[in-house]
C-alpha cells in the first residue's frame, strides 16, 4: 500500500522513517492515522508497507517516506534490510503490554548493529495506546527513564484519539534533518580542507 505521489515531489527533501516494534502495538494504526487521519483498529500484519506523503516541516515542504515493518519474529531475518534503508526510527510499544516495552531494547540493539557505522541515529521511543490508561502496564517513569538512558525522547501517543501522532513524526523528521545538515557540514569541511592542502602543494611546487 502506498500513497499517491504527485509531480514535483522528487525535488523535495526526503526523510525516511522506519516504524519498529512488536506486533499489535499499533505501528500501522499510527502510520495510517498520520497519513490519512483514519483510525484502523484491525490491521493484517505484512512484511512491510511503504507510504509517502508531502508535509510542511517548519515552513519547508518535504516528503516523508514511512516503512511500517512487521513485529513478528517470522520477519526478523529480513528486518535488517529495512533498517539499513532508514534514516530515523520510531520505536513503538504499547503502554498496555509490558512485554512489548521490554522488546524495545532488542529492537534498538538490532538497529544499532545494522547502523553501526553511524554516530547518532535519530530515534524516538513511543508509548502508544495512551487512551487505554486504565489498562496501563508500563509506568511513565519507567519508560522515560529508559529513554533517558538511551539519550532519546519519549512520547506517549494514541492512534485512536490522534494524541501526539503528528508530534512524533515531525520531531523525528527534525532529528533526521539536523543529522543530515551536520553530515553535509562535515563533508564540506573535509572538502574545503583538501582544497586548501592542494593549493598549498601547488604553491610549494611553484
Swiss-Prot record:
Residues 204-206 form a propeptide. Prenylation is essential for membrane localization. The farnesylated form confers resistance to the proapoptotic and anti-anchorage-dependent growth effects of some geranylgeranyltransferase I inhibitors. One of its GO terms (biological process) is cell division. A lipid is attached at residue 203 (S-geranylgeranyl cysteine). It catalyses: GTP + H2O = GDP + phosphate + H(+). Its main location: membrane. It is an enzyme of class 3 (hydrolase). Residues 180-189 have a biased composition (Basic and acidic residues). It is found in: Cell membrane; Midbody. Keywords: Apoptosis, Cell cycle, Cell division, Cell membrane, GTP-binding, Hydrolase, Lipoprotein, Membrane, Methylation, Nucleotide-binding, Prenylation. Residues 180-206 are annotated as: Disordered. One of its GO terms (cellular component) is midbody. It is a lipid-anchor. PANTHER family: RAS, DI-RAS, AND RHEB FAMILY MEMBERS OF SMALL GTPASE SUPERFAMILY. Belongs to the small GTPase superfamily. Ras family. This is Ras-related protein Ral-B.
